[in-house]
Amino acid sequence: MSDALIRLDQVGVTFGGEAVLDSIDLSVAPGQIVTLIGPNGAGKTTLVRAVLGLLKPHRGKVWRKPKLRIGYMPQKIQVDATLPLSVLRFLRLVPGVDRAAALSALQEVGAEQVIDSPIQTISGGEMQRVLLARALLREPQLLVLDEPVQGVDVVGQTELYNLITRLRDRHGCGVLMVSHDLHLVMSATDQVVCLNRHVCCSGHPEQVSGDPAFVELFGKTAPSLAIYHHHHDHSHDLHGSVVAPGTHVHGEHCKHG
């Protein structure tokens, strides 16, 4: 797409003779939320490294909009308990950031109250907001969020997902979000890509959220969950494994008596 912020064309990565990523096509446009899901070992971390420019693919290419500003939120950080590091000092590790800029970013994510707290003492939900604030300091056109709700309770997850949507709306940035849960994805996602070393399925949540078989499978949690159609000659079960012919994951074309 001509208005893409980033585009991967037939990207392949091989480690030790084994394909970690195979023929990956992916793009993110301004204002679009793309959620990448898949089991452990599916290549999600490798793909993120390629998006961030930390890894050069062995095949295919990664195109980025010229002078693209990327804000990256890591899955988590480990800080030595004896290190005297406040949230403010942590945010000021980003070049050019002063207290006013740090406070503004924290206010945007609803975490301004922790600005002077030792970073080791804040809660899991507060830490995720601080990491998100750090990603916003670069005024990014593209946000790359690796497990943004990790270690947060269900209520906190909903609040964080709503916050991410508001940030997208406010800044018009694209969002690439990574999840290690095959089927738990935020309802505001525009596009979901299921990765298992290759792109095995993709789609819009709205395409399946109202399907009877989908609702039957997930019950009351259906609006927050999505199963996507596979475009290959195989399917994956709920754990990401390839299932034998004759079995399937429910989709919108399922007919149940």
Curated annotation (Swiss-Prot):
One Gene Ontology term, aspect cellular component? plasma membrane
Which Gene3D superfamilies does the protein's record reference?
A: P-loop containing nucleotide triphosphate hydrolases
Q: Which residues form the signal peptide?
A: none
What this protein is called in its record is Zinc import ATP-binding protein ZnuC
Localization in the cell: Cell inner membrane
Q: How does it sit in the membrane?
A: Peripheral membrane protein
Write down the EC number: 7.2.2.20
Function, as annotated = Part of the ABC transporter complex ZnuABC involved in zinc import. Responsible for energy coupling to the transport system.
